[in-house]
Amino acid sequence: MAIPGIIDQKERIVLKSHALGIENYSLRFLEQALEIPVYFENDANAAMLAEKKQKYPNAIYLSLNHTLGGAFCIDGKLFRGQNQKAGEFGHMILVPSGRKCYCGKLGCADAYCAASVLTQDNRQSLDAFMEKIESGDEKILQIWDEYLDHLAVLISNLRMAYDMDIILGGDVGGVLSDYMIPLGEKVMAYNGFEHDVSYLKNCSYKKEASAVGAAKYFFTKHMGEL
């Protein structure tokens, strides 16, 4: 199962999930209820696992869903960090003293780059938002341009910090393929060391990447144990 939050796989505990509003929450009851082994993974980590590690042995995955998550692989393996918090890019401060994030802090990247930024004020689906972009709605075009600006800053910072390919995934990542040129131009404006954005990649799965990655990982794990 893929869950938005920091997961202790060994102990089957959600250490922290702002999205679900839980902390130190045991998941072992599911194993007891279902009477079968149940495995858990952070949703962004699972989405990263859906990508081919041979193609992206060293890469960052930006999960641009209702909330912003992230993950990254080194030498084809997920890097989880000392406390399972590696890849929490959504809670890096992007704009000091900026918008309030759902975690309670001000200026988090999530408050500027999550898919909810495009839908919450307009009370519409992402598909409807993108249709208005295509129709030339000036207000929506302005929101989209500001969104790409903030996303470009985040991407540039991650590229400078990690020097890896960056895979754009999640709901927004699934629609970005037609907007890579304007996004790339914005990214290059913030990065004085590179003259192209060939490191920006579209995700392999536009929908349900976390489900694919979770299934792929644990199927491979069990096949190796047979």
Q: PLM features: what roles do these ranges have?
A:
Residues 4-6, 66-67, 172-173:
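Short glycine-rich anion-binding loops that position phosphate/pyrophosphate groups of nucleotides
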Residues 5-58, 178-190:
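Glycine-rich phosphate-binding loop and adjoining helix at the ATP-binding site
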Residues 8-9, 16, 22-24, 91-94, ...:
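Generic structural "secondary-structure junction" signal
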Residues 26-29, 34-134:
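Glycine/GP-enriched mid-protein hinge/lid loop-to-helix segment characteristic of carbohydrate kinases
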Residues 33-36, 55, 100, 105, ...:
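ATP-binding/phosphotransfer module of carbohydrate and carboxylate kinases, centering on a glycine-rich
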Residues 17, 91-92, 167, 199:
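Sparse recognition of residues in long alpha-helices and their boundaries
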